[in-house]
């Protein structure tokens, strides 16, 4: 099971270089399992035992498995994750021609570790909006090939590079695509028009706009002398999206279950398709049209917010509280923060610990050092919007927000197992 899941995750990561592609890949899996698309602009006819999914902005998805028992009776089991990761996004007017090179201006999306982006084989993917035959259309594209690079400055020209180096994103991050002749003018939109034709056979009249991100073309892989680790881009948080999908598709229950994978978590979630927007609340309200039933059901429900946790790094162990250093391959981590940066409380943590014990899955705890700030997740946001009880958990990870992150190769199976038990559980606290 472990090897099969790891291979599945590697394939999922390769197919999902952007939130748009991640959502499209999730859609493919759910449709293959018989889930039906619901359009938010249409009237819904929800059936007992039905399987559905809803997307918004092509970058967020909610998958729904209606139980044979009314959600008013047993509540709803929700798992939440996010589809976005820190990256470099192409600017609207990106063309730069300097010293005979064609470069693209980029904007840093989220809290990225910038140094690892240098000297990598980069490709480009995302969504393009264009006009064709007088109509506005959108399509996903992925160049797949390594078409760009951000070369480092040689140490001979930067003798203090290893003593600490502040990266200027405006000046130092524009990737190089090609060399150009002196009077040749690079045209990025023409490049996108050609890619639409090559990839989809579409003859666009004009490219109107785009949301495109650079990504590392190196595939994810199981690494380490004994294959102990899983290395790859976007583990935060496509690992949790994949685990939630596997758990939902491979469990049967009389209870209603949701997988919620939203965009824009890395930049605060405040968007129409983010956790701080109304998407999830509106969907659940349509499943439970009565306001009385909605409130009663939410109070019987529970959300597991799944997002990667900081594993204790052997070279930087002092960055963790000595009693709360999650180890790779030692199971999922319950995240706790007294200031509500995580939504976990004793009741929800106890229930998750109970699930892990019942499934013989190891479980750990994380609390940030008292002299350090704490990050947050979609957990507190969703808990406050819906009023739903929530536990924040995640798999321990090194190099979070780097271009290539590292997790334990045994932990994915642990997470899928306990999320499956949650979806199948007959009783919630």
Swiss-Prot record:
Tagged with keyword Secreted: no
Keywords, alphabetical: Aminopeptidase, Hydrolase, Metal-binding, Metalloprotease, Protease, Zinc
SUPFAM superfamilies xrefs: Aminopeptidase/glucanase lid domain (SSF101821), Zn-dependent exopeptidases (SSF53187)
Gene Ontology cellular component annotations, sorted alphabetically: cytoplasm
Record-linked Pfam families: Peptidase_M18
Cofactor(s) needed by this chain: Zn(2+)
GO terms classed as biological process: proteolysis
Binding locations of Zn(2+): 82, 156, 401
EC number: 3.4.11.-
One Gene Ontology term of the molecular function aspect: zinc ion binding
Root EC class: hydrolase
HAMAP family xref list: Aminopeptidase_M18_2
UniProt family annotation: Belongs to the peptidase M18 family.
Protein name per its UniProtKB record: Probable M18 family aminopeptidase 2
Organism per entry: Pseudomonas syringae pv. tomato (strain ATCC BAA-871 / DC3000)
Protein's gene: apeB
